[in-house]
């Protein structure tokens, strides 16, 4: 009799030896992160202020390599998972650091497969928080580029909300890092039961427009 294949456990756990190294690094290092970046968070309405519970995909603009650390300092009560581009990895040790210390998953920026998207959606479905940068590259000027559809596809397959985030790159180290967290964006409600490329593109465009709105809120906050 053939052995039943054991399904992987993607369920989020409050405590797990799997995440022990990450948790130690996070709680030892977040004080330095708070002091260095000094995040000042603004919310787009009361709904955006609610705690991020259960499965969710965070969609953020991408201004520097430090973005994952900035986001982690913004919402300390959750374990964040990120993606790392395989072309950035030079050796096995780097790969181990990304996977075990930063809880990141490898992805090919030139050809992300549907299999990868399916895995990520299953991981999110287990109650995890995945952060993505849908611009697909770093934009140091803070101007938000068009969004690719990967974040929306993962959120759709996981039936998870997208939490839009905008953060402004500070000009000087003594400035605070300004961050705006938006209302949950429910992809399933936007697209409906039947997924198509056109509907995915429309939803990506709508999410991009909302990100521009968050950028405007951030700029207004800076002027105050």
Q: What would you call each of these model-derived segments?
A:
Residues 46, 87, 109-111, 135, ...:
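Proline- and acidic/polar-enriched loop/turn elements at helix boundaries
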Residues 50-111:
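Catalytic core of membrane glycerolipid acyltransferases/transacylases, capturing the structured
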């Amino acid at each position: 009799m053939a052995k039943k294949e054991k399904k992987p456990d993607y369920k989020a756990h409050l405590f797990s030896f799997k995440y022990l190294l990450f948790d130690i690094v996070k709680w030892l290092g977040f004080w330095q992160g708070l002091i260095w970046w000094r995040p000042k968070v603004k919310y787009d309405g009361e709904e955006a202020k609610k705690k991020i519970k259960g499965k969710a995909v965070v969609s953020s603009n991408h201004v520097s390599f430090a973005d994952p650390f900035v986001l982690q300092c913004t919402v300390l009560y959750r374990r964040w998972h990120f993606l790392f581009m395989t072309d950035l990895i030079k050796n096995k040790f780097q790969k181990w650091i990304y996977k075990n210390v930063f809880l990141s998953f490898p992805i090919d920026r030139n050809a992300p497969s549907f299999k990868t998207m399916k895995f990520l959606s299953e991981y999110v479905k287990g109650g995890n928080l995945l952060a993505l940068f849908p611009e697909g590259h770093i934009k140091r000027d803070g101007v938000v580029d068009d969004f690719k559809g990967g974040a929306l596809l993962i959120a759709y397959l996981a039936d998870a909300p997208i939490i839009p985030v905008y953060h402004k790159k500070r000009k000087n180290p003594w400035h605070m890092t300004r961050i705006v967290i938006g209302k949950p964006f429910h992809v399933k409600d936007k697209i409906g039961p039947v997924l198509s490329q056109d509907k995915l593109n429309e939803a990506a465009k709508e999410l991009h427009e909302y990100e521009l709105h968050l950028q405007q809120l951030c700029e207004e906050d800076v002027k105050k």
